[in-house]
Regions:
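Core catalytic region of metal-dependent phosphoesterases/phosphodiesterases
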Residues: 2-101
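Active-site environment of divalent metal-dependent phosphoester hydrolases
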Residues: 11-16, 40-43, 64-70, 129, ...
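Glycine-rich phosphate-binding loop signature in dinucleotide/nucleotide-binding domains
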Residues: 24-29, 114-115, 148-150, 192
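Active-site-proximal segments of metal-dependent phosphoesterases and phosphodiesterases across multiple
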Residues: 79-83, 115, 119-149
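Anionic-ligand binding region
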Residues: 140-153, 157-178, 188-190
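Acidic, His/Gly-rich catalytic cores of divalent-metal-dependent hydrolytic chemistry
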Residues: 166-175, 179-301
Length: 301
């Protein structure tokens, strides 16, 4: 019976992707699909794209593919083009080659596996790659989301949290994240779907099981520094590096925190945010800090 591996939210994390590629090879799967967000939130997007293209794995387009393509095409507010808060996004967009961008731009929003005609794979929901399904999604919300679905099995991603949920006669699976898990487990995460040989006519014939793969996070720390991404992206790159350490969402909580304070993102808020969020010691242990040349909390490079 067929085995289908689905991975997503790689987010330019090559060491995590390489560990998952090796694990998939050991699982004897028959088909592999990438459910979006190959790039963004990390420094090696071009390398990830080349890896996936060389393997010939089918992909769908995630919201971060859209974000970086929009930056490259100038489809973003004028203020973002010089705003230090968006320096990391500009860096990531420029890191992609023309061939990378063309590949990402051609990706579909939905994919049906060759060996799973009753499965639909999307990045977020059938309606949008910027919406997500997570443990917090209510039955009423899920019912609304599934009205757009024309198959009994939905595989999605986007929230960076693995999920397996039966809803009536349907199965909803969130892959979790390869490169930036937000469930407190720093291992790279993906899912394998196995077809059940004895499923009845009205039964869901797929069984889902997540895989959790350890990888060398020290290598990721070195890549952040050696590529120049940590310096170029300012506080946003530092917050993304902290997400690698904590396996929790850090950037979005920071932006919400800043908005509530009526401030703007910048190094002057770094220490206060980390202290209030309880991540100061984690950041210190990982060597993630404001530029030492900045005496007043304002970034100086």
């Amino acid at each position: 019976m067929p085995r289908i591996a689905v991975l997503a939210d790689i987010h330019a994390n090559v060491p995590a992707l390489d560990a998952v590629i090796a694990d998939i090879a050991a699982q004897r799967v028959d088909e592999v699909v990438v459910a979006g967000d190959l790039v963004g939130r990390g420094p090696l997007g071009s390398t990830v794209v080349r890896r996936i293209r060389a393997l010939g794995w089918a992909c769908v387009r995630g919201n971060h593919e859209d974000y970086l393509l929009d930056f490259r095409a100038g489809r973003v507010p004028v203020g973002w083009r010089g705003d230090p808060a968006w320096a990391g996004a500009r860096w990531m967009a420029e890191e992609l080659s023309e061939a990378d961008a063309a590949f990402l731009d051609a990706l579909p929003l939905t994919h049906t596996p060759r060996l799973g005609s009753d499965i639909r794979i999307v990045h977020g929901t059938p309606a949008s790659n910027r919406e997500g399904i997570g443990p917090w999604t209510t039955d009423a919300q899920l019912a609304g989301i599934l009205t757009e679905l024309d198959a009994p099995v939905l595989v999605c991603a986007h929230t960076h949290r693995p999920l397996i949920r039966t809803f009536g006669a349907r199965l909803v699976v969130n892959t979790g994240s390869v490169g930036l898990p937000f469930n407190g487990d720093p291992r790279a995460q993906y899912v394998i779907l196995d077809a059940e040989p004895d499923a009845g006519d009205d039964a869901i014939r797929w069984h889902a099981e997540h895989r959790y793969v350890a990888y060398d996070r020290d290598q990721v720390r070195r890549i952040y520094r050696e590529t120049g991404f940590l310096e170029a992206g300012g506080i946003v790159s530092a917050l993304l590096a902290l997400e690698i350490e904590t396996a929790r969402s850090v950037l979005v909580p920071y932006l919400v925190w800043i908005e509530k304070r009526g401030g703007t993102p910048g190094w002057s808020t770094w220490s206060t945010f980390l202290d209030e969020a309880g991540w100061a010691e984690t950041a210190r242990a990982a060597g993630i800090h404001a530029p030492r040349s900045s005496a007043n909390g304002i970034e100086e490079h």
